[in-house]
């Protein structure tokens, strides 16, 4: 599995923002089985800065989805995060370890400050609708009071 990030700002000639957004340290995810644990992600470390896009690529069953599910705290049994930190650096300067939050404490972060976009046939963009319509629809699903103009700039 490979994870690479690139700055969209740098590619478009804008000044890059060196602010750290997400820092993953020593993340391990195991699948718990009757015959013992199977390590799917072993000591994953990376840093993602604001304005960067992270792509995760690899062979089938190498742990890509397991890693992304762990980052969003979306994994289900038998998968379990066994070690590591998922540090979210908020714009206000606070740093929160998402791996240690309860579901209730995680709620203000999930889908508003951090989200995972999975590749899936059912999650593809609709070729019949304009892109802007699809983005507005997603934004309004999370914030029904959001004006169309604000949804497009977000």
Name every feature range the model reports, one short phrase each.
Residues 2-154:
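ABC transporter nucleotide-binding domains
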